[in-house]
C-alpha cells in the first residue's frame, strides 16, 4: 500500500491499524483496518475524508474574495454536514439492511484550514465480489432485491 497520510493517527480509535486500501470516491478513501486481541483479528472499514480535499481547494475559495476566516467558516460548514451524517448513521445503527456505523474521529489540522474525518464502519464484501464468487440462484437474487428495498425504507 502506498503511503497513507491517515497512518499518522494510529492507533485509530485506540487500537486499530490501517492495513489495506479498498478504494476511493468523490468523498475520500476507504481502507481495511484491523485490531488484534487475544489472538483474534477483528476487521472494520475506515472511510477517510479530508476537508478541504487539498490546498488548491482553499486557494480557489479564497480567490473568490473570501478572507481566511470566511474560508475557515465555509469549510467548517462542510464538516458540520458530516457531523449531521454521523448523527443520522448512529440512529440507523442496528438496522440489518444498512452498513453499521461504529465510531468516528474528527481531527482539526494545526496551522492550516482543514480537517480529517475518519469513520469506522462495518466491513462488508462488495456485491460485485459476492456475485463473482458464486452464481446466485433466482431465490437469492430476489432476497437481495427485497433487502435493498427494505434498506431504502429508512
Language model segments and positions:
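Structural motif at the C-terminus of the N-lobe alphaC helix and the adjacent alphaC-beta4 loop
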Residues: 87-96
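Protein kinase catalytic-loop region centered on the HRD/HxD motif
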Residues: 150-154
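ATP-binding glycine-rich loop module of kinase domains
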Residues: 36-83
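Activation segment signature within eukaryotic-like protein kinase domains
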Residues: 144-145
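Short beta-strand micro-motifs within the conserved protein kinase catalytic domain, predominantly
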Residues: 100-115
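Structural motif in protein kinase domains
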Residues: 122-132
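Protein kinase glycine-rich loop
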Residues: 19-26, 30
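Juxta-kinase regulatory segment immediately upstream of eukaryotic protein kinase catalytic domains
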Residues: 1-11, 19-20
Amino acid at each position: 500500500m502506498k503511503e497513507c497520510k491517515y497512518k499518522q493517527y494510529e492507533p485509530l480509535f485506540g487500537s486499530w491499524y490501517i492495513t489495506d486500501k479498498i478504494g476511493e470516491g468523490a468523498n475520500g478513501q476507504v481502507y481495511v483496518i484491523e485490531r488484534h486481541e487475544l489472538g483474534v483479528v477483528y476487521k472494520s472499514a475506515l472511510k477517510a475524508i479530508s476537508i478541504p480535499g487539498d490546498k488548491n481547494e482553499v486557494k480557489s475559495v479564497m480567490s473568490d474574495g473570501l478572507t481566511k476566516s470566511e474560508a475557515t467558516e465555509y469549510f467548517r460548514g462542510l464538516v458540520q454536514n458530516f457531523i449531521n451524517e454521523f448523527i443520522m448513521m448512529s440512529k440507523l445503527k442496528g438496522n440489518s439492511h444498512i452498513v453499521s456505523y461504529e465510531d468516528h474521529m474528527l481531527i482539526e489540522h494545526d496551522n492550516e484550514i482543514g480537517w480529517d474525518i475518519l469513520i469506522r464502519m462495518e466491513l462488508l464484501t462488495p456485491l460485485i465480489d459476492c456475485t463473482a464468487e458464486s452464481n446466485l440462484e433466482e431465490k437469492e437474487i430476489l432476497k437481495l432485491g427485497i433487502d435493498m428495498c427494505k434498506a431504502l425504507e429508512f
